[in-house]
Amino acid sequence: MDQLIQLVEATQQRNDIPEVRPGDTVRIQLKVIEGEKERLQAFEGVVIGDKGMGASKTITVRKISHGVGVERIIPVNSPNIESVTVVRSGKARRAKLFYLRKRTGKAALKVKERKSASAEA
């Protein structure tokens, strides 16, 4: 039974999505269907948490829009995702960055930047 579940999940996994961790700033291009029209909508924000694994993995992305915090829970393996780009890698000491919800202004998006391996060499 377990092998059957793994087989089904393996077919639903997407390999074109980069590894995203809490603290990273990401830009996600989502397909939005309005009536008969289809367009792309960009959502850029800080990943404040991830949940699940395999085909059911989701990430929570938070951004500040016109002074109001907006969070969106996005299934990583959704067919509505056109692309995911890591704009900035953040260094977080927690798995869930819910403390960012209490912050306002620029402090709400402030996460230390992670040094990349290529920058050190």
From Swiss-Prot:
Molecular function in Gene Ontology: structural constituent of ribosome
GO cellular component: cytosolic large ribosomal subunit
Keywords: Ribonucleoprotein, Ribosomal protein
SUPFAM superfamilies from the UniProt entry: Translation proteins SH3-like domain
A Pfam short name: Ribosomal_L19
Leader sequence residues: none
InterPro entries, per database record: Ribosomal_bL19, Ribosomal_bL19_CS, Ribosomal_bL19_sf, Translation_prot_SH3-like_sf
Record-level GO BP terms: translation
Record-stated family: Belongs to the bacterial ribosomal protein bL19 family.
Protein's job: This protein is located at the 30S-50S ribosomal subunit interface and may play a role in the structure and function of the aminoacyl-tRNA binding site.
Name assigned to this protein: Large ribosomal subunit protein bL19
Organism field: Chlorobaculum tepidum (strain ATCC 49652 / DSM 12025 / NBRC 103806 / TLS) (Chlorobium tepidum)
